[in-house]
């Protein structure tokens, strides 16, 4: 509602441009946000899509992602994986071990030229066989020919989803 938007804007020093409803799935929420920008005539050159659960983001990472989006059209914050990763079969048996040197843990922000991500999302929304979409980079990878650049992030940019994550995030914030 307009009242909720005013309350959010008051609390966040007018940094909030538009407030829109989320969706059933993550991709629905992102698409709703992209659509709201267009509907309200606030179409930017670039958008950064970020998880609210990643509270330890830094200004430096945001600025880096903006620069990378300007240079590459599409980029995602990421860190090299530390652990060995296994591919399993449907019964829970390991069937393959990918080379760890080629694996990255994807984070947010995920940064794109607005028109690129909007076009990709519009194609995805029309595709009934879209499959399991877990991040915005997947949408660009699947529905455009643009390659997504992996932008070195920090292991401190964690997603807070469990009580243990809260303890870890608090330790980062206290430093």
Which residues does each PLM region occupy?
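A generic structural signal for alpha->beta connector loops
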Residues: 13-16, 71, 91, 145-147
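Acidic donor-binding segment of Leloir-type glycosyltransferases
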Residues: 1-18
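Conserved beta-strand scaffold positions in the cores of enzyme catalytic domains, especially
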Residues: 19, 74, 148-150
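Short, flexible, basic/aromatic active-site loop/helix in glycosyltransferases
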Residues: 87-112
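Conserved alpha/beta core of the MobA/IspD/sugar-nucleotide pyrophosphorylase nucleotidyltransferase superfamily
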Residues: 104-175
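Short, conserved catalytic or adaptor-binding loops enriched in Gly and charged residues
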Residues: 8-13, 96, 140-141
């Amino acid at each position: 509602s307009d009242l909720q938007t005013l309350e959010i804007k008051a609390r966040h020093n007018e940094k909030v441009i538009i407030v829109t409803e989320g969706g059933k799935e993550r991709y629905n929420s992102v698409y709703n946000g992209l659509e709201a920008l267009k509907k309200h005539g606030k179409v930017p050159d670039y958008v950064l899509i970020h998880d609210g659960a990643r509270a330890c983001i830094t200004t430096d990472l945001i600025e880096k992602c903006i620069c990378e989006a300007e240079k590459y059209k599409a980029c995602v914050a990421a860190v090299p994986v530390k652990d060995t990763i296994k591919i399993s079969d449907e019964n829970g048996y390991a069937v393959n071990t990918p080379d760890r040197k080629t694996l990255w843990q994807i984070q947010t922000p995920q940064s794109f030229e607005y028109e690129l991500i909007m076009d990709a999302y519009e194609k995805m929304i029309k595709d009934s066989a879209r499959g399991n979409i877990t991040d915005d980079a997947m949408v660009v990878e699947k529905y455009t020919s643009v390659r997504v650049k992996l932008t070195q992030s920090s292991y401190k940019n964690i997603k807070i989803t469990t009580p243990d994550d809260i303890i870890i995030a608090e330790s980062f914030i206290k430093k």
